[in-house]
Amino acid sequence: LILNFAESKLLPQGDVTIEINGDSEKNIITRPGSTLLSVLAGQSVFLPSACGGGGTCAMCECQVMEGGGEILPTETGHISRSKAKDSWRLACQVKIKDNMKIQVPDEIFSIQKWEATVESNNNVATFIKELVLNLPEGENLNFQAGGYIQIDIPEYHNLSFSDFEIENEYHPDWDQYKIWDLVANNDEPVFRAYSMANHPAEGNRVMLNVRIATPPPPLWNEAPPGLASSYIFNLKPGDKVTISGPYGEFFIKDTEREMVYIGGGAGMAPMRSHLFHLFQTLKTGRQVSFWYGARSVREMFYDEHFKEIEQKFPNFTYNVALSEPMEEDNWSGHTGFIHQVLHDEYLMNHEDPTEIEYYMCGPPPMINACDGMLDSLGVDKEMIAYDSFG
């Protein structure tokens, strides 16, 4: 009560105006007190925010020219001093108190929101589902390969993992680790970002690769399972899902350089998007190789699709390394971690690894290992593009 009283005295009692890009037609009239990110979203101005407004992804940057107050400690770890001097802020951390003037990229106004329908939601690996969503009839998601969408996660309670539809071939690990026993709860609506696996020619639908997020078994009583992935794993054909997009910056560079793609786990999504666009649409003549790390044969997906591309295009090679192949896999290919296999089998003998463009998406340990390996070869950071996730 004391805090509410103090806030009521500190904030203006009337409406405030947010001027966007100096265009009075885009003005937003709102009550003070909310974050800039949430107010903009409420007016269909969808800044990207992979963390759902938690201040950790630093993707909701915009310029607050007037009325934003001083930059906060929660922002300075993400915004450089030079950018801060140019009035860059994190919209999720800026509380609306006074009239404001802000600048956002023009492409933000092309972002839309839809109610999509689940077409299918099948496992492609033990802990990864391929979620396919259809947009409303006549709608099209005009995006670049490597883009992502944000999906709204509603409030839900007592969502039981035992209700998930998991194909029988993946049951052994779910049984062994008793994953069926988990229950998820979400106390308030949030949103999360997922890279699209579909490419622009498939623009009337959205395909995601989503890995279920669970804590290690010893922490099940202390740490909850992932809010978004639990919700997504429970979706059934015909269900309605709210998404917004397109967003993104993990795009194909318009050069003639050689390209090396490195992926692991659900990091497959933007790899598929890029590679299908490069070869099915652009029919590129660039030299391209794809290096994917999986645990075992059961965790390999879209395998036949990439083999087909390899057969049709002599300028493409597809390489897989298994870190823990099973006896029944009868695996005769590469083993070990993908960064080491890429180094030993290709880059170590390449005439100039520093002239290659690298595109990476996968779990942080894989990204970190690849970074170290490429740094040891003298590859400049500007030659590396990331779609990193936690």
Feature map (PLM): residue ranges:
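Fe-S ferredoxin-like electron-transfer domains
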Residues: 2-5, 9, 77-134, 139, ...
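Residue-level marker of beta-strand positions
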Residues: 59, 101, 148, 237-240
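Ferredoxin-reductase
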Residues: 117-237, 295, 321-325
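A short, basic/flexible loop-to-alpha-helix module at the beginning of a structural domain
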Residues: 231, 244-257
